[in-house]
C-alpha cells in the first residue's frame, strides 16, 4: 500500500488498482481508463503512478 499526501491535505491511499482518499472518494484504473466521481477521467492512463498524479492534481498536486 502506497500513501501520498496532497497540497490540500487530502491523503491518497493506493491499493492494487484503486485509489482511496481521506475525503471518502475512490478512483480506480481499469485497463487504460481512470474512473472516479461517476465518470471516466482519462482514457489514456498508462500506469498507477500516472493515475496517482492525475488524482493528486485534483487536490492541488503532491505535497
Name each model feature, range by range.
Residues 8, 20-24, 46, 56:
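Serine/threonine-rich, low-complexity intrinsically disordered segments
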Amino acid at each position: 500500500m502506497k500513501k501520498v499526501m496532497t497540497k490540500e491535505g487530502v491523503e491518497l491511499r493506493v491499493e492494487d488498482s484503486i485509489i482511496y482518499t481521506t475525503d471518502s472518494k475512490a478512483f480506480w484504473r481499469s485497463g487504460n481508463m481512470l474512473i472516479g466521481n461517476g465518470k471516466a477521467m482519462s482514457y489514456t492512463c498508462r500506469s498507477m503512478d500516472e493515475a496517482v498524479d492525475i488524482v493528486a492534481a485534483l487536490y492541488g498536486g503532491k505535497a
